[in-house]
Amino acid sequence: MAFHEIKVNDLNENVFNLIGKDWFLISAEKEGTVNTMTVAWATVGILWQKNVVMVAVRPERYTKEFLDASDTFSLTVFDKSYKKMLGYCGTVSGRDEDKIAKSNLTINH
């Protein structure tokens, strides 16, 4: 699967399905290392004429350290064939193993 950026205004998918049923990854970088986790809780909307997404991340999650340390993060949507990988990335901590490598994911900046 090739990586390509999708502008939010070009998104033709049902965001409720993307968030609640299909899930997605949130990833951030800290000190040259990237961590990711599966997200199934989020809201999307418009705030002060800007498109926004708010993602719920528990304070004790390892990924939160990366989000707090970074000015940016990415949200990545996958097709249904990646559901098993998304389940894995949502249950295993990056503190314990390299989820990105074990999932055969590629980081693209």
Sequence positions of predicted segments:
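Active-site-proximal mixed secondary-structure blocks
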Residues: 1-109
